[in-house]
């Protein structure tokens, strides 16, 4: 309650606002947190971190980890929330081009989109050729965009070896899906080199 009073008394104090956000994270109240962040963004009082956190919440709703009410989700993809997450991550990068988290999460998000379009296309009847071709195009575009963001993330020195190996694993799968076999060999070599450093 003192945090809420503080944010009312000192609406321009980002330390108080950050403390309030941390409280909601620790108490698993993501939707309440999202409402708080929406208010700060609407009031013009938000930096890159606010957009990133809102993007993360929308991302979690989009992949079905939680529902729009903050309850445990059933794993159903909601592309509307994924698009909201994408816009927030892009705004994060606009305000802070050095945000590794936003860059990496955009790679994951585009992978999710690509997988969604793949699965949607695979369920179509054979007669739906035009729709199938359109979905396959979206699938490829998103996988290529995911690779682009992961390649950008690879340029950050703050990635640990473990995180980098995990990311190279994602990239290997994407290179396989986009039929870039030479790149798979390159990822295998990078993974082997990093494992030897452990």
Feature map (PLM): residue ranges:
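Structural register within alpha-helical repeat arrays
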Residues: 20, 54, 61, 106, ...
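Residue at a conserved register position within TPR or TPR-like alpha-solenoid repeats
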Residues: 24, 58, 65, 110, ...
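Short coil/linker segments at helix-helix boundaries
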Residues: 60-84, 112-149
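Structural marker of alpha-solenoid helical repeat scaffolds
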Residues: 9, 43, 95, 156-160, ...
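Canonical positions in the second alpha-helix
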Residues: 6, 39-40, 91-92, 153, ...
């Amino acid at each position: 309650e003192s945090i809420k009073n503080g944010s009312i008394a000192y609406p321009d104090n980002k330390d108080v606002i950050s403390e309030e956000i941390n409280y909601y994270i620790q108490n698993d109240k993501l939707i309440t947190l999202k409402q708080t962040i929406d208010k700060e963004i609407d009031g013009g009082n938000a930096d890159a971190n606010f957009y990133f956190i809102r993007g993360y919440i929308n991302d979690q709703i989009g992949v079905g980890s939680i529902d729009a009410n903050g309850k445990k989700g059933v794993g159903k993809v909601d592309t509307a929330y994924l698009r909201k997450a994408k816009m927030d991550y892009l705004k994060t990068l606009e305000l802070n081009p050095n945000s590794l988290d936003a860059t990496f999460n955009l790679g994951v998000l585009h992978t999710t989109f690509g997988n969604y379009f793949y699965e949607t296309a695979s369920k179509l009847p054979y007669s739906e050729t035009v729709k199938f071709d359109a979905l396959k195009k979206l699938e490829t575009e998103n996988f290529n965009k995911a690779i682009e963001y992961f390649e950008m993330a690879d340029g950050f020195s703050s990635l640990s070896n473990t995180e980098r190996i995990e990311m190279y694993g994602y990239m290997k799968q994407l290179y396989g899906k986009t039929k870039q076999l030479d790149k798979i060999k390159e990822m295998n070599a990078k993974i082997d080199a990093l494992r030897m450093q452990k």
